[in-house]
């Protein structure tokens, strides 16, 4: 059906148990991709527990090759880790052991993804399959900021791609749907092109441009931000920030961000003391008000750093175990971190005061 922005295709499925599924494909005028999602509705009289519900599938790749297309299909993925983001990894289907078996009985699967709130951890939520003989590329990315999975799988000649939310097996995900309730998957952005993986990535990334129209006005122009971390290395002060401001004034920076360390106590490194978030009277003897004023006087908007989800071992908050995440009854601890239980109303109020309250008090933007 036609919409104001493009076209939509709605396909409906149902079974004898009273379960219904609506597949929605959306195309936006002028774009080289489309979106896909699924909506599950429980029309039964009892609740149902979903253990897996994908957002998309593309199949029978490649129709331009005879048989299994030996050594012709390439799988492109983007790997990542902190400070090493976006490494393109290209493997043949044979390297991934996705040739069909002699009997076509079993399904071979290459499943990857991530578990938790970091959307890019080891892999980007992206995959592309290239027919290297005919130079055709199929690609997809997920619009999802939590646990996800992708699967490249094969049982016979055709290769398939599917994915969406991490399922119960991979991501410990399960959702109870009460009678009459519905559940909608995250969107997937899909495309196919004649060209290479760079063109495919351009198509998928370009699909996000329409959503940029809804960002705050201050971000419409992609403002340039100066973050002082690599200048003070976790030791910002009113004095050294004043010197930095003098050096960078008139250089086109719109924001100046005060990074970690503004809260540290004397003799305690910043990376083991986050969590209490009290302004250091030694580093900022006149409080943050004076420093924020200096930033504005130089024509920049002030910003400030928080790492709100965790606490360091030298912070008093580290011992506030009633409100920290636990595993097997004990606080979940790493080498230098414990973590707030973000579902705890006390934590929400505490961070509301320490984070939101600080932003509002000093006028950080």
Per-range role (PLM):
Residues 159-171:
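Short, structured beta-strand/loop micro-motifs enriched in basic residues and often containing a Trp
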Residues 221-223, 230-236, 303, 308-362:
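Active-site-adjacent "subsite" loops/lids of carbohydrate-active enzymes
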Residues 175-194:
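Short Pro-Gly-centered flexible turn/kink motifs
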Residues 203-255, 259, 264:
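An acidic-aromatic substrate-binding cleft motif
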Residues 1-156, 171:
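Polysaccharide-binding surfaces and accessory modules of carbohydrate-active proteins
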């Amino acid at each position: 059906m036609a919409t104001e922005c493009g076209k939509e295709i709605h396909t409906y499925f149902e079974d004898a148990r009273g379960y219904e599924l609506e597949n929605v494909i959306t195309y936006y005028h002028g774009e080289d991709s489309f979106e896909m999602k699924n909506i599950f509705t429980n029309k039964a009289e009892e609740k149902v527990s979903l253990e897996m519900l994908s957002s998309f599938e593309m199949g029978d790749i490649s129709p331009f090759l005879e048989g299994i297309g030996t050594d012709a299909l390439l799988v492109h993925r983007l790997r990542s880790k902190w400070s090493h983001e976006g490494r393109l990894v290209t493997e043949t289907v044979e390297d991934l052991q996705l040739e069909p078996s002699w009997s076509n009985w079993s399904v071979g699967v290459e499943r990857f993804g991530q578990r938790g709130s970091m959307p890019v951890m080891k892999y980007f939520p992206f995959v592309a399959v290239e027919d290297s003989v005919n130079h055709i590329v199929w690609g997809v990315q997920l619009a999802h900021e939590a646990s996800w999975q992708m699967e490249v799988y094969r049982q016979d000649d055709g290769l398939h791609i599917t994915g969406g939310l991490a399922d119960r097996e991979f991501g410990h995900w399960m959702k109870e749907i009460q009678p009459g309730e519905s559940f909608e998957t995250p969107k997937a952005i899909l495309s196919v092109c004649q060209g290479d993986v760079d063109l495919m990535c351009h198509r998928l990334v370009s699909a996000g441009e329409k959503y940029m129209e809804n960002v705050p006005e201050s971000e419409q122009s992609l403002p340039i931000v100066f973050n002082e971390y690599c200048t003070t290395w976790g030791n910002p002060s009113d004095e050294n920030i004043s010197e930095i401001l003098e050096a960078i004034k008139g250089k086109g920076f719109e924001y100046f961000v005060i990074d970690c360390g503004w809260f540290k106590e004397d003799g305690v490194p910043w990376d083991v003391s986050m969590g209490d978030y009290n302004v250091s009277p030694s580093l900022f003897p006149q409080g943050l008000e004076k420093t924020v004023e200096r930033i504005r006087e130089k024509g920049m908007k002030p910003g400030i750093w928080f790492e709100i989800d965790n606490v360091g071992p030298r912070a008093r908050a580290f011992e506030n175990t009633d409100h920290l995440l636990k595993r097997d009854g004990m606080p979940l601890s790493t080498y230098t971190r414990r973590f707030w239980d973000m579902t705890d109303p006390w934590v929400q109020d505490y961070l509301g005061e320490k984070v939101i309250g600080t932003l509002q008090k000093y006028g950080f933007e």
